[in-house]
C-alpha cells in the first residue's frame, strides 16, 4: 500500500482520487504507518518537514530522498542514525523508462539499497553511483529529458519549415530519438561510431551534421550539463 501526506486538502483529495492511495495531513501520521519514507519536497522545505511537531523518524525508517542537491550528510543531521538513500530520478519515470541514480548514506544497508533499487527499477533503470557524482548525474539524466524535449521540438519545427504537418513532424522526431537511443543501448556501439555510419560521403546527413557543428551543438549540450550540475551543487549549499 502507498500513502502520501500533504497539508492542502485539495492536494490530498486529488492524490486519493487520481492514484487511489492513502493520504495523511501530516508527515507524523504517515511515518507511524510505514518504515519506508520518500522525501519529495523542495530543498527549502526540508527543515520544516523534519521539524514538524510529533514527527518521529529513527533508525527503523528507511528514507529515500529525491530532494535536488541535498546530501545524505545534511539529511542525517536531521535524523541521527537514520538510514538515508539519496536518489535522482527523472521525468521519464512517468512512462516507466526512467534513468535513476542512487547513493547510500553512512547508515544505509545492502538490504536498503536492494529495496530502493527495486522501487526504481519498477519505473525504469537504476544505477548506484558515488554521492560525489550526484550533481553530475543531475546535469545528465535529471535535467536531460528537458534538453531532449527541446531537441524534438526544434526538429519538428524544422520539419514544419520544410512543409510537414506539425503532428507528423513531432511523431517523426520523437520516434527518431527513441530509435536512436535504443540503438545505442542495444548495440553497445559508441554514439560517434553510429553517427558516422549514418553519414554517407557528400550526403544529406553529413550536411546536417555540419550545420549543427557550425552552431557548436556539442558545446551547447556540454555547457547545459555543467550548468545544471553547478546549480545542483549550489542548491546543496543552500544557495
Predicted features, each with a name:
Residues 84, 134-139, 191-196:
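Short pre-catalytic strand/loop immediately N-terminal to key active-site residues, enriched for Gly-Thr
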Residues 74-83, 99-136, 148-186:
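Internal alpha-helical scaffold of NAD(P)-dependent oxidoreductase catalytic cores
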Residues 1-18:
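NAD(P)-binding Rossmann-fold cofactor-contacting core
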Residues 9, 18-19, 26-102, 106:
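Rossmann-like NAD(P)(H) cofactor-binding subdomain of soluble oxidoreductases
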Residues 88-93, 138-148:
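Glycine/serine-rich anion-binding loops at beta->alpha junctions
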Residues 174-239:
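NAD(P)-dependent Rossmann-like dehydrogenase/reductase catalytic/cofactor-binding core
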Residues 2, 12, 30, 46, ...:
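Small-residue helix-packing motif on alpha-helices
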Amino acid at each position: 500500500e502507498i500513502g502520501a501526506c500533504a497539508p492542502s486538502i485539495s492536494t490530498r483529495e486529488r492524490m486519493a482520487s487520481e492514484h487511489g492511495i492513502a493520504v495523511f495531513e501530516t508527515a507524523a501520521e504517515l511515518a507511524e504507518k510505514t518504515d519506508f519514507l520518500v522525501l519529495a519536497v523542495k530543498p527549502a522545505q526540508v527543515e520544516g518537514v523534519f521539524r514538524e511537531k510529533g514527527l518521529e523518524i529513527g533508525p527503523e525508517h528507511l528514507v529515500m530522498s529525491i530532494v535536488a542537491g541535498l546530501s545524505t550528510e545534511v539529511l542525517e543531521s536531521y535524523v541521527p542514525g537514520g538510514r538515508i538513500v539519496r536518489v535522482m530520478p527523472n521525468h521519464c519515470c512517468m512512462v516507466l523508462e526512467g534513468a535513476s541514480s542512487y547513493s547510500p548514506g553512512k547508515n544505509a544497508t545492502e538490504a536498503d539499497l536492494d529495496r530502493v533499487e527495486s522501487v526504481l527499477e519498477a519505473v525504469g533503470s537504476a544505477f548506484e553511483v558515488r554521492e560525489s557524482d550526484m550533481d553530475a548525474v543531475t546535469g545528465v539524466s535529471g535535467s536531460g529529458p528537458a534538453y531532449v524535449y527541446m531537441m524534438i521540438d526544434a526538429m519538428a519545427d524544422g520539419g514544419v519549415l520544410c512543409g510537414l504537418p506539425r503532428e507528423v513532424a513531432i511523431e517523426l522526431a520523437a520516434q527518431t530519438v527513441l530509435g536512436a537511443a535504443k540503438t545505442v543501448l542495444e548495440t553497445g556501439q559508441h554514439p560517434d561510431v553510429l553517427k558516422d555510419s549514418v553519414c554517407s560521403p557528400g550526403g544529406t546527413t553529413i550536411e546536417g551534421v555540419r550545420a549543427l557543428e557550425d552552431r557548436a551543438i556539442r558545446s551547447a549540450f556540454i555547457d547545459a550539463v555543467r550548468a545544471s550540475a553547478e546549480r545542483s551543487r549550489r542548491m546543496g549549499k543552500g544557495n
